[in-house]
Amino acid sequence: PLIMTRDYIDRSLEVFPLEFLEMKLIHQLVYGEDVLKNISIGKADVRLQCERELKGKLQHICQGYIKAMGNKSALTDMFVGSLSGYFPEFHGILFLFDQKLPKEKGAVISAVENLFDIDLGVYKKLLEIKSQDTHPSAESLKEIFEKLYRVLDTLIKKVDEFEIKPA
């Protein structure tokens, strides 16, 4: 649970737009006024944070892939461990393009796939590995890395090319 004042939220929206977008999407009000209901999240702020986060994730998987030196357990842990961190960016991308923001992870993946006509099956594969606690082969992990790299590169370009239209 988080406790925040309206002033704190207002002063933090441009710094943490993805976090507030996620909170607005999934929060449950326990008591008092719903201060997240009418917050205004700027597309320019979301675009910037999405690009920064996606580029950071691309660096992370590249560095992690090299650092793991073929260790299947380390690679699996890195890929599966970082999985949930992609969904705020996916929500941000959908927000930028005025799409519905699904809560269920499979639906989020499908929405981004449909938006850009790209294959995000690698994320579905990672969800499957996580839910079934499986241990992929070295070849499968190499394919996962290559697919993640290509998908992230494509998403970064899409976000980078997104134009903020004046109000």
Give the positions of each predicted feature:
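Conserved nucleotidyltransferase catalytic core and NTase-mimicking acidic/glycine-rich helix/loop elements
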Residues: S40, D45-A167
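Conserved catalytic core of two-metal-ion nucleotidyltransferases
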Residues: P1-Y31, N38
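Short acidic (Asp/Glu) and glycine-rich catalytic loops that position anionic groups and cofactors
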Residues: I3, E33-D34, Y86-E89
